Amino acid sequence: MAETTEPPSDAGTSQADAMALAAEAEAAEAEALAAAARARARAARLKREALAMAPAEDENVPEEYADWEDAEDYDDYDDYEAADQEAARSASWRRRLRVRLPRLSTIAMAAAVVIICGFTGLSGYIVWQHHEATERQQRAAAFAAGAKQGVINMTSLDFNKAKEDVARVIDSSTGEFRDDFQQRAADFTKVVEQSKVVTEGTVNATAVESMNEHSAVVLVAATSRVTNSAGAKDEPRAWRLKVTVTEEGGQYKMSKVEFVP
C-alpha cells in the first residue's frame, strides 16, 4: 500500500505556530496564577471577617478556615489586583502576537517578491545592455571593414589592368564619392596606363570616430608602395584618411573620402 507523503510545512509558518503556542501557554499559566491569587485573597478576607466576629480569647476557629493559613500573605486586594493585571497583560500580549506574526510573515513574503522582481528586472536590463553593446560592436566592425577595403582598392592599382582596378573602386563606393570618381574614371585610367603605375596599398589601422544607424566616419591609416615610369621603385607613401562609410543594401561602401594632414 503506497504511503501518502504530506508536503513539508512552511518553516516560517511552523515557527509562527510554535511562538503562538508558547504565548498561549504563558498566558494560561498567568491566568492560573491570577485565579489562585484571587482565591487566597478571598480566603484571607473571609478569615479576617470570621476572626472579627469571634471573641478574642475564643480559640475555636471553624474548620473551614483551617486551611487558609497560607493566605496570610494577602492582607488586602493589592496582590489580587496585581495578579489580575498580570493575567490581562499576558492575554493582551498573546492577542498582539497572533496579529503580529501573520503580519510579519506577509511583509517577509512581500519583500521576497520585491527582491525577486528586482533581480529579474536587473537581469533583463543586463542582457539587453549586453545585446546592445554586442550589436554596436558588430556594426562598428562592419563599417571599419568597409572603409579598409575601399582604401585598399583606391591604393592598389596596376596599369596592366587599370580599367578593372578603377571599376573595383567604383563598385566599393557610393553617393558623392562614387559620382565624382565615376566622372573622372576615364581620365584617371589613362594617367595610370601612361605612367605605368603599380601601387600596392596596405591599411595599418582603422578607428570608428562616429556612427549612426546607416553610416559611420572611420579614420584610416594606410601605406602604399609606388612604382612608375618616372623612376619610382616601391617608394613608400603614407596616407591618413577620414572615410565616411554608408550601408547600402547590406554592403558597406565609401561615400566620402577626405585626406587628413
From Swiss-Prot:
Zinc-finger is among the record's keywords: no
Subcellular location: Membrane
Transmembrane segments: 107-127
Membrane association type: Single-pass membrane protein
Keywords: Membrane, Transmembrane, Transmembrane helix
Protein name, UniProt field: Uncharacterized protein MT1408
Subcellular location, principal: membrane
Domain of life of the organism encoding this protein: Bacteria
Region of interest: Disordered: 1-22
Family stated for the protein in its record: To M.tuberculosis Rv1362c.
Keyword Transmembrane: yes
Classification of source organism: Bacteria, Bacillati, Actinomycetota, Actinomycetes, Mycobacteriales
One Gene Ontology cellular component annotation held by this UniProt entry: membrane
